Amino acid sequence: MSLVGRVGSLISQGVYSVATPFHPFGGAIDVIVVQQQDGSFRSTPWYVRFGKFQGVLKGAEKFVRISVNGTEADFHMYLDNSGEAYFIREVDPAANDTNNLISGSENNNGNQNNGVTYRLEHSLSDSGTGELREGFDPLSRLERTESDCNRRFYDFQDDPPSPTSEYGSARFDNLNVESYGDSQGSDSEVVLVSIDGHILTAPVSVAEQEAENLRLNTPQFHLAPGDGTEFCEGNTEFASSETPWDTEYIDKVEESSDTANIASDKVDAINDERNDLDSHSRDNAEKDSHDAERDLLGSCLEQSELTKTSENVKSEEPGPTFEDRNLKEGEFPLRTIMENDRSEDEVTIESIDTLVDSFESSTTQITIEEVKTTEGSRISVDSNADSECKDEQTSAETAILFNNQESSISVDSNADSECKDEQPRISAETAILINNQEGGIIESEDQDSERVSIDSTREEVDKDNEDRKTVVSVGVTSSVDEGEPDTDQRYELSLCKDELRQGMGLSAAAEVFDAHMISKEEYINSATSILESENLVVRIRETYMPWTKAARIVLGKAVFDLDLDIQPDDVISVEENESPKPKDDETTITPSSSGTRWRLWPIPFRRVKTVEHTGSNSSSEEDLFVDSEPGLQNSPETQSTTESRHESPRRQLVRTNVPTNEQIASLNLKDGQNMITFSFSTRVLGTQQVDAHIYRWRWDTKIVISDVDGTITKSDVLGQFMPFIGKDWTQSGVAKLFSAIKENGYQLLFLSARAIVQAYLTRNFLNNLKQDGKALPTGPVVISPDGLFPALYREVIRRAPHEFKIACLEDIRKLFPTDYNPFYAGFGNRDTDELSYRKLGIPKGKIFIINPKGEVATGHRIDVKKSYTSLHTLVNDMFPPTSLVEQEDYNPWNFWKLPIEEVE
């Protein structure tokens, strides 16, 4: 029993001496940073793994904090579902600059890839070639290699290895950031109005999309049936009809040749707010229906000239004419095709004189003039007898509300100067609203302009404004004033729940959200899988909510027009102890003079371009999010926000394991060894942490490489297990020899094909190794990227550790100048070690192979066998101090030694 007790104590002593904070599925590998001649830095990849079990953690917890020498860095890493840490870097796709990584670090010489994306994949194959390879795909797809053979430098999958390289340069994968604008697509159109799932659009060709403004002279508007049901079910971008739009809209007006649908005896009025308007509209509808029946094939669109001035409006100063606003005389014929039980009702406006206004940029101002009544106009309404407009909300949202169907409308462009101060803002999306609170269009002598604002709520008519006779709003999306908060909301979707965490900051959260934002094409192709994803997050202004929490708000808004409150518990709090700042596009409005509110759609439209056709193309483009929010005056802050949103689709984010030169410089590394800690906190597991070292070397450093298993230890397999039971299984004299080499100015590099999960054990084994009072000198411990079983399979069964070693050493060599070889000598225990060292250009005389008996052979010379102890006596000859200026070829050891005899 005493023997068993002693064995148990030895095992416990050995385990606790090397495995105090042991992570069975994770680890971090030492990093080498080389300072260049110009002061910049190059680094080996930072490979950190916490284990696959971390994949079940919440996205808000997957941020890895970095601490160097006890000081926390000002940047962090991300943690993926496999427990692997990585950096995200933004590159400029316009220049196709991926920073041309060398050994996973930035090429600080300023080299670019000149339009071609390069990546470091398998930096060495079996033959040991480790050149940069041209990427097969541009930075537009996610390239994440999961198999062992495709890992570069480290692989965290427990798969069998392949003959290809496993220690390559940094993984430099592209995060798929789709352009979420429509400006890069095919011919687009301008959304002018939306009525119950229908879209009023004007076509914009591809060539015209590059212009900042487009002017519509006499465009044809087609009101096509939209997919209202699908739109309400979650589409955040408005889908228009599938048919291509006619782009010849400048000088031509399409004549309607469709067969008119002859309606029955009665048509309900569009607006049922006034009974007299009800009956009046019904009588005119019946009359026009019989007129259309006599015409057989429908109505003919008549053109009339715009009334530029009004005889009854007195103004001291003439306002801007239509020529000043780049308008051409004409009218806007509208054809509305609405779907009702698979039958089409056609509403034709045959002669309306003034449904034309300025389609300038989103900052265009326009005065709403007085409305005049003209006799002789006619509006024909053809509708099925069964189609009745019973919904007050629907009638309130109708694009054109007719108040007197026996009238034509003229807009006076000569407005009083006082009206000019009340000009509402107009964007590319134009709604045409004609409303009369008294049941008809009445001539008014009032000089003040009246405005109608489109908002998400409809208010009652103010009693103070009942004396105002007419309200005409042409091209108004919203009125921008201050005083009333914006109540409308815009929803954006992204699959980033696993990467959002509490307190990460608004800018960091926005970066992560935009990196995984769902575009319209992605939603159309895979809407079901997106909605079922657990990582789906909805952004409402600056608020981030999981889809499970935001579904009630989005659906309530889309279906029932409800503005449900956002519960604080439902929100992912990404603010850094500060209240969220309101977005630039959150504006306030005041009630319009008429007191009546109109809204076109309860949820956002898709992105469209400002419409104004000019002779020259503008260098700047501006995209707008079109919705029912109040319009926004283009202040400098607003323009910068809009431009940044327009540029965001062009951003390219890449995944890499190498920090930038600026990030490395911010760490303030000291020469030699630096302690680095990687940690993240979870509510369940607490703080998880792995440690490693960063070694800062100069560009002219000389490196001596040493294998671990079989070279420092006595055998490959037993050397990994004997330290666990407290047994000394090391080669005698190794600590003293390596210490003497280090004292002469050389840096030691410990290279092992062990798995990454053994990084901590290997590092502590070497740090605790002492012989005759002499400790083994410190140096970076670089080990294999593979999992435990693939590493053992390659090391013990296949006997091919050189595959990893050659690739690893090649990448380290690339940290140094191209005309300088930093590797001076190498120690190993196998022929494969010699093969690896020869590939790196180490001469035969500096390659030392040791056998299990402790005998050291140089250059396979069997008759000249030494031990580590005997080599120590020659250390100053074989490893002369680096401070000496004497050339090594002429020192006593190399100059006077006997040449090797030639064997015939």
From Swiss-Prot:
Residues 254-293, 305-326, 440-470, 574-595, 612-655 are annotated as: Disordered. GO terms for biological process: cellular response to phosphate starvation; galactolipid biosynthetic process; intracellular protein transport; lipid metabolic process; phospholipid biosynthetic process. A motif (DXDXT motif) lies at residues 707-711. It is an enzyme of class 3 (hydrolase). One of its GO terms (cellular component) is Golgi membrane. Changing G83A: Reduces activity 3-fold. One of its GO terms (molecular function) is phosphatidate phosphatase activity. Residues 265-293, 311-326, 449-470 have a biased composition (Basic and acidic residues). Residues 703-857 are annotated as: C-LIP. SMART domains: LNS2. The keyword Lipid biosynthesis applies. Belongs to the lipin family. This is Phosphatidate phosphatase PAH1.
